[in-house]
């Protein structure tokens, strides 16, 4: 008798960026050529709301349903990106270069609604995060071993004030596949936010 194995998917929920914002952020990657870092591909730049890990098909369908419901009751809003810096904050040695955004009330309401809805479902494996969260984009991941070889006073300063804004009109259910050339992301479902009335 054949045994069928449910597919496992590496899933996260994200805010994807408009092309012009991706291009402007990718342009900053050439500003620090001396930095030992793996830069994020332009097409992969995004803001992660929640990383959900590996899910089977049934769990994925439930996550999709929840995400659509949450999106439909939260209105469009804007995000302002204001700084490029090492991240996470206070982490030594730094692990990444981040683009940080302002934490608006609309962003907080959306993320809290999503977290609450996922946590109260008995059909998906989800644990709320007990840490403060602000919107950020991983611009690149630092090669730690190479970073440690650089004398502290010679390590490049990454602390750039920027001013980029964009409107968020949807959130996306994303699948990440780990390939030899790096992660490949696929949008599984686009969940539109509620239009302003």
List each model region and its residues.
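Histidine-dependent nucleotide/RNA phosphoesterase domain, centered on the 2H-phosphoesterase fold
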Residues: 2-197
């Amino acid at each position: 008798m054949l045994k069928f194995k449910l597919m496992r998917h590496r899933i996260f929920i994200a805010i994807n960026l408009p092309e012009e914002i991706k291009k402007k952020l990718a342009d900053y990657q050439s500003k620090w050529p001396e930095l030992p870092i793996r830069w994020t591909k332009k097409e992969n730049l995004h803001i992660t709301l929640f990383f959900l890990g590996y899910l089977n098909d049934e769990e994925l369908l439930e996550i999709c349903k929840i995400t659509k419901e949450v999106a439909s009751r939260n209105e469009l809003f804007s995000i302002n990106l204001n700084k490029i810096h090492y991240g996470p904050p206070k982490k030594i040695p730094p692990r990444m270069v981040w683009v940080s955004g302002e934490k608006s009330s609309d962003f907080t309401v959306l993320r809290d609604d999503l977290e609450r809805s996922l946590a109260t479902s008995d059909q998906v494996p989800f644990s709320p995060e007990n840490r403060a969260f602000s919107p950020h984009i991983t611009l690149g991941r630092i090669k730690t071993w190479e970073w440690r070889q650089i004398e502290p006073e010679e390590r490049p300063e990454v602390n750039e004030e920027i001013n980029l804004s964009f409107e968020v009109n949807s959130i996306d259910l994303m699948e990440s596949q780990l390939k030899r050339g790096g992660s490949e992301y696929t949008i599984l479902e686009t969940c539109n936010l509620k239009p302003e009335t």
